[in-house]
């Protein structure tokens, strides 16, 4: 008898409400073809919930979803009614911190039918992963303001790095590199950030000693961004601190054509808590309700979830179906087509079912 996987479904705001159903449609097709059983538990925590309750989620949110294997997440944010920092820190960042989702994983891959803004790049030439530390570093939320509103105003925000935090993300990245092309690149800025980044470099070098078969190098973040644009074929696995990983994980998908179809995973590799899978794109209030949002980022995030749950063949089937639709259509308007959100979801689900 197949194991039933309990998944918390949070569409969130804006186009999250439109693309999540398409992701579920494809995952249901996967379930039929591969004999996987899902239990979808739906939660309406969003900026709409905030408008009614004054907070993004109920006080017992952790009890409600803490026993699920994964969270299938749409998008969060409705700036017209809720400031972005309140929406993010009241939901998504809580999941990352309190569920110890210390790995943010983003594939960077040039797909068929998606033109890269980089001249003459073809599918197969851009194919790597960005591994971002997701719970500490530059995004510590530690600091404050003094003498607000005066000419003496001082603002301090501190970075917080821990040995356990750095070592576990580096271990994950080196092990991923071992499974792929045995090449790891570390992002740094130790020529300008004189305490935390030299320490980060030391941790990378120390961890590399455990993986003698993995070739590794490091670049300062400024030149690394340039290399992403000029030489994206150099990379296989790129590991970075929270801030630098945040920058790179938007730049990478942009180099491969569009961040509009990019997926991401926020992982607790030990599976002590649920991991979260979401598209990179935001809630896009400007197109919400028009039925034109591209669902591929959400569907591809579902493929990452399948891989994490132990179904690599099912994950590969979804990615193959995505590639076919990107190459042959139907496409949404952002991809120079005229298909609706649902039509793209239908096409990918049909390809998955057909095998």
Task: Pin down the residues of each PLM region.
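Glycine-rich phosphate/nucleotide-binding loop
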Residues: 228-330
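Glycine-rich phosphate/pyrophosphate-binding loop and the adjoining helix
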Residues: 135, 141-185, 190-194, 312, ...
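N-terminal glycine-rich phosphate/adenylate-binding segment common to multiple enzyme folds
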Residues: 51-156, 243-245
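Short acidic loop-to-helix transition motifs that present clustered carboxylates
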Residues: 113, 219-226
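Buried hydrophobic positions in well-ordered alpha/beta secondary-structure cores of metabolic enzymes
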Residues: 13-16, 69, 131, 173, ...
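Buried hydrophobic packing segments
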Residues: 23, 27, 204, 298-306, ...
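Glycine-rich phosphate/diphosphate-binding loop of Rossmann-like nucleotide-binding domains
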Residues: 8-25, 30-31, 150-222
């Amino acid at each position: 008898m197949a194991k039933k996987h309990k998944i918390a479904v949070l569409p969130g705001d804006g186009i999250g409400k439109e693309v999540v159903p398409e992701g579920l449609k494809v995952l249901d097709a996967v379930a039929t073809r591969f004999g996987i059983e899902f239990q979808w538990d739906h939660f309406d925590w969003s900026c709409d919930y905030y408008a009614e309750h004054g907070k993004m989620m109920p006080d017992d949110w952790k009890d409600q979803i803490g026993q699920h294997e994964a969270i299938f997440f749409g998008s969060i944010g409705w700036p017209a009614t809720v400031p972005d920092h309140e929406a993010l820190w009241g939901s998504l960042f809580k999941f990352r911190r309190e569920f110890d989702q210390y790995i943010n994983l983003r594939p960077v891959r040039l797909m068929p039918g998606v033109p890269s803004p980089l001249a003459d790049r073809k599918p197969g030439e851009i194919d790597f992963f960005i591994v971002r530390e997701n719970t500490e570093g530059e995004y510590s939320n530690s600091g404050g303001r003094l003498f607000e509103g005066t000419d003496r105003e001082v603002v301090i925000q501190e970075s917080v790095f821990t040995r356990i935090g750095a070592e576990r993300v580096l271990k994950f990245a080196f092990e991923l590199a071992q499974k792929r092309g045995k090449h790891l690149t570390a992002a740094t800025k130790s020529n300008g950030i004189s305490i935390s980044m030299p320490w980060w470099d030391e941790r990378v070098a120390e961890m590399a000693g455990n993986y003698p078969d993995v070739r590794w190098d490091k670049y300062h973040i400024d030149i690394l961004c340039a290399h992403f644009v000029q030489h994206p074929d150099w990379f296989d696995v790129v590991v970075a601190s929270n801030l630098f990983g945040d920058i790179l994980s938007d730049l990478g998908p942009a180099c491969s054509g569009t961040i509009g179809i990019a997926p991401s995973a926020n992982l607790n590799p030990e599976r002590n808590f649920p991991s979260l899978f979401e598209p990179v794109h935001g809630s896009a209030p400007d197109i919400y309700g028009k039925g034109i949002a591209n669902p591929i980022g959400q569907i591809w995030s579902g493929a990452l979830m399948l891989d994490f749950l132990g179904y690599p063949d099912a994950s590969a089937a979804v990615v193959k179906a995505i590639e076919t639709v990107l190459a042959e259509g139907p496409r949404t308007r952002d991809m120079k087509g005229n298909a609706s959100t649902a039509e793209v979801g239908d096409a990918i689900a049909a390809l998955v079912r057909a095998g």
